[in-house]
Amino acid sequence: MNKYTWLFVFLLTVTIINYPNPFNAKAGQTTTFECTTDTAFNSTLYIYDMTARLLFKRDLPMNAGANHFGWNGYTEQNELVNSGVYLYFLTDKNHSRVGKGKVWVINR
């Protein structure tokens, strides 16, 4: 019998930020999401309004390290969102890795 029992814990981490925040989609600005992850995986970006209505969804391949992708402030139906705060979530297919945050759109 082995005297030692080894426990390996693999931490699958996702760090995500976006900039500029706030941004003016009406003036043609986009916000850039910067996602840093420790392993490659296929992900999905979801953007919701504050009533939990899904406005935007995009499947994105993630590489280990830094990844960059943008959002122009338009829904999947190509409609400009109103000024306000929106929630974003980045998940893998099992929803076991989650990056999340808020993005503020100011349309003037």
What do these predicted regions represent?
Residues 14-20, 26, 32, 83-108:
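C-terminal tail/sorting-segment detector
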Residues 34-39, 49, 92-94:
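Non-cytosolic beta-sheet module surface loops
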Residues 41-44:
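Short beta-strand/loop motifs in extracellular/secreted proteins, especially
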Residues 29-38, 71:
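Aromatic/hydrophobic beta-strand junction motif of beta-rich domains
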Residues 48-55, 86:
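Short, glycine-anchored, charge-dense loop/turn motifs used at functional sites
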